[in-house]
């Protein structure tokens, strides 16, 4: 199922039954519609809340299609396919036609992000401590390098594109990399199972969901210090910024 939440009332207002579409995971919103993955079916779908209908489905052909993002203009969709060890770039080729290009990367790609200039996609391998860089325009792997994580979960760029943040639940760390040099700047101990990463548009702080400790760690991105913790419900993970 997919739940629709009223953010003002802070309650669920609708629950969409996906039927035979199993294990939904990644979510992304574009032009008022919700794009989602279903890992078991190897597909991405689109839900229109105005009509309460799933109005589009597309197979990726890749095992365990997990996370999803769209380009700013909606002309491309990106997915991480964990068991397939690939990143898919899905480009619109006509009014209703899409071309799926799947690029082999490190083992177990899960967290990924697109650089602020839209030119590259970086994906973290959850099973081998790798980061893979992809040239989006040419749909090719640039390089893969190792960041020595135990299990990378999420990867995020700061808005200026200078820093790369990677959460490592098994080590309890947040890794901060310099994008240009690919060198470690700091590894911050956050607690039990840090996972989701949220960086607001001003880039001043990072919010990291510490799943096992039921809180969100707040990191100052100038000093790289842990400056606050926000208590949450049980097992926080994914987060979103509401404008």
What positions do the PLM features span?
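Predominantly soluble domains enriched in secretory-pathway, periplasmic, or organellar proteins
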Residues: 1-243
């Amino acid at each position: 199922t997919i739940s629709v939440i009223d953010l003002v009332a802070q309650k669920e207002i609708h629950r969409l039954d996906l039927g035979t579409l199993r294990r939904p995971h990644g979510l992304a919103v574009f032009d008022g519609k919700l794009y989602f993955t279903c890992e078991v079916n190897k597909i991405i779908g689109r839900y229109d809340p105005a009509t309460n209908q799933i109005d589009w489905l597309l197979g990726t052909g890749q095992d365990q299609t997990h996370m999803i993002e769209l380009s700013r203009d909606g002309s491309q969709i990106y997915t991480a396919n964990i068991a397939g060890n690939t990143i898919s770039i899905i480009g619109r080729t006509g009014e209703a036609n899409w071309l799926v290009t799947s690029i082999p990367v490190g083992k177990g790609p899960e967290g990924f992000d697109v650089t602020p200039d839209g030119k590259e996609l970086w994906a973290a391998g959850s099973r081998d401590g790798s980061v893979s860089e992809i040239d989006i325009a040419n749909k090719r792997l640039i390089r893969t390098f190792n960041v020595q994580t135990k299990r990378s979960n999420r990867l995020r760029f700061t808005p200026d594109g200078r820093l790369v943040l990677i959460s490592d639940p098994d080590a309890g760390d947040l890794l901060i990399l310099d994008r240009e040099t690919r060198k470690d700047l700091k590894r911050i101990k956050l607690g039990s199972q840090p996972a989701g990463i949220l960086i607001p548009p001003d880039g001043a702080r990072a919010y990291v969901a510490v799943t096992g400790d039921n809180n969100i760690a707040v990191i100052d991105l100038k000093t790289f210090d842990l400056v606050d913790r926000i208590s949450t419900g049980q097992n926080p993970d994914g987060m979103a910024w509401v404008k």
